[in-house]
Amino acid sequence: MTVMTDPMIAARGILKLLGQTVDEEDLTLAHESLDYGYPRTAVYCGVAAALQAEAPIAENFRQLIINEFAWPEAELKDVMDLLEHIPLKAA
């Protein structure tokens, strides 16, 4: 069992929210990454799954993804690039 740190809890919540618009089957890699203790990787995989599914993400949810983690600069750029190509969900 993985120890639940603040980033782990945040990632689990983000994946739960993504699961409302992305099939759970498409989030398998994200959940596996989280189970292995990699919350940022889990969120990245979840965002990639949302892009592939063309699932819209609201602006406040985008900000949560960006601001909830201490992203290394290169990873932050990758996440922002993915988010840029995902449709914006109307509030």
Regions found by a protein language model. Give the residues of each.
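C-terminal-biased regions
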Residues: 2-91
